């Protein structure tokens, strides 16, 4: 990995050495993407591309290229964002799998943001008890988070990702070309997961943001290196702990509080923005518990602010957010578990913090 943080980015392959080893390949263009999909899918005869509405043209182009290579390729359009991750949407996908005759030898392609890769992975995990899936994420958030690591799932009225399974992809295709047309708000939101990787593991990431926040949002600046670094952090964790029994919990930094904000806001908040305020709350919680310094918390605010991420949330009372946090999948024995930092780059768990600590962190995080 280069240290120049420049645009001289060459194709990069990051191996995720977990239960079923696979590669995340970072490059530019649909030609590269098609070639990597064919390589990863192996003897597949049939492809189903599950995609979001804005990606209909890219799905059609990919389908055309797969057909030209001698394969049957089908497309199925799903709703945008979290509205795609429902039991009804999953049932519609299963119907399409049956209609096009998808067998255990075939491959699903998840084309789109995190909701598309989450749903496509869930369909692949459940159709005929598991078929191959290749993820082709098209948002920054999906590239560095949702598409890597094998988590799949759909939402229920009770909460986010409560139904799902672990089902690793055969490959993840990170096509930097799609970032050229990604709305700025999506680029900013996706940055939250990269910043998170810096706070929990690779502190070099934080230095890159501090040196030039604008270059960190530029597909021809330092962003490609940041993407690779964030994926490497996740790959290193997932290789040790696929199913979130221990180490993988550190990837949830900012997520316990962030998911509560998302749920309370009925998913109107972008995931990255919610995780950003979650990191502030959890940094303030660590400070209240005597772990982090005021300077460490300020560093959180400064970096998140520098790329346009939210650093406070006052849309709900703490008790309302605690009710949502009480349903978090990481909880054990009725106690809410938080990922916090002992120091920058060194995460730990804080289980069942006192109401006094929670209220102090909440007051500080909303600026009270």
From Swiss-Prot:
Transmembrane segments: none
Enzyme nomenclature, EC number: 4.2.3.4
Cofactor: Co(2+); Zn(2+); NAD(+)
Catalytic activity line of the entry: 7-phospho-2-dehydro-3-deoxy-D-arabino-heptonate = 3-dehydroquinate + phosphate
Entry GO CC: cytoplasm
Localization annotation: Cytoplasm
Protein name: 3-dehydroquinate synthase
Tree of life domain: Bacteria
Pathway assigned to this chain's UniProt record: Metabolic intermediate biosynthesis; chorismate biosynthesis; chorismate from D-erythrose 4-phosphate and phosphoenolpyruvate: step 2/7
GO function term, MF aspect, one: 3-dehydroquinate synthase activity
Positions with a binding annotation for Zn(2+): 193, 255, 271
Keywords: Amino-acid biosynthesis, Aromatic amino acid biosynthesis, Cobalt, Cytoplasm, Lyase, Metal-binding, NAD, Nucleotide-binding, Zinc
Name of the gene: aroB
